[in-house]
Amino acid sequence: FSLLFLLPASTSFANHIKGGFFTYKYLGTTGNKLRYNVKLTVYMGCNPNPGQLNPTINFSVYDAGTRQHIRDITVDMSRQADLVKKADEQCITGDQSGCYYTIVEYDLAELELDANSAGYYIAYQRCCRIANVDNLIASSTIGNTYMIQIPGSNVSVEAPRNSSATFLVNDTAVVCSNSFFTFNFSASDPDGDQLSYEFCDAWVGGSQLEPIPSRATAPPYDVVNYSFGFSGGQPMGTNVKIDPTTGVISGVAPNITQTGEYVITVCVTESRNGKVIASTRKELHIRVAPCVPIQATLDPVYPTCDGFTRTFSNNTPSVEIKTHYWDFGDGNFSTEAQPTHTYADTGVYKIKLIVNRGDACSDETEADVKVFP
């Protein structure tokens, strides 16, 4: 009997957390009371065991000015679903279909709060993350903190009537190691506020000794220990950036050193009439796979200072690339994979490469060739 009793506790903190985010929706005001719908979306590994699926959790509420604990609210699980990619990408090698995440939502239909000047923090903490995350040290021992701030009247009179930005839940983009990729991390705002995006730190929360704290602590929170070469601002290294206006992450994906999982946290700031109203954050493990996309990739510029002849090749070769078409920008062309071309005169030429020309998996790119012998 005692062994059966202990099993759920031991499995409850097994590695499974893969990110998540809070959102809230303003419902109205009655007297001095503000009402909100608050929802937490949690990403976890597929096929979680029963100890990892908590039927109820606690949202902890704090005064944002004093950090005083206001109350804990028990919230029921409202939805569970798998985020599945049903088919492989036609123009990428390898298998990409299958389950990427199990999504669990906790929806608090109505939270009533006293109007105040500083606003409120709402937090939840849970341990632990999956093992062997490439950009974290000892990831399986690290928990997670999810938090969002509801603004108070000290931001503006209208700020407490704000509804947060909300992120899309469509995170099955295929990212291939050492290849260029884009990943849409954009959000939408029901109030029409202007949104800006930046990478930010992932937070620690919970522990192996206390995997499910009954009360989340108040901020500030400890930052996770990133592996060498990575940080909250550079979660996938120096070659990956986020567009501050669109929220699209792009760049050349790093190598796979362990599982290929990289923790990414994006903070979104809402501005109204030029003034910051609120912010929210989403954390997610992006999976980097050992696949090869069909891409035409060249260096931005090819300088030649020792003659008129240059050899070219695609920077992202693949067995799935069947044909090459080169336009050297001077009226000459080639269909070789690695052509050598001699220019007749000095100048700057626009070279174009098309791979699998006329095929469903065609791609093209351009670069400048500067001939100054």
Q: Whereabouts are the PLM-identified features?
A:
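Bacterial N-terminal signal peptides
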Residues: 1-8
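Sec/Tat signal peptide C-region and signal peptidase I cleavage site
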Residues: 10-14
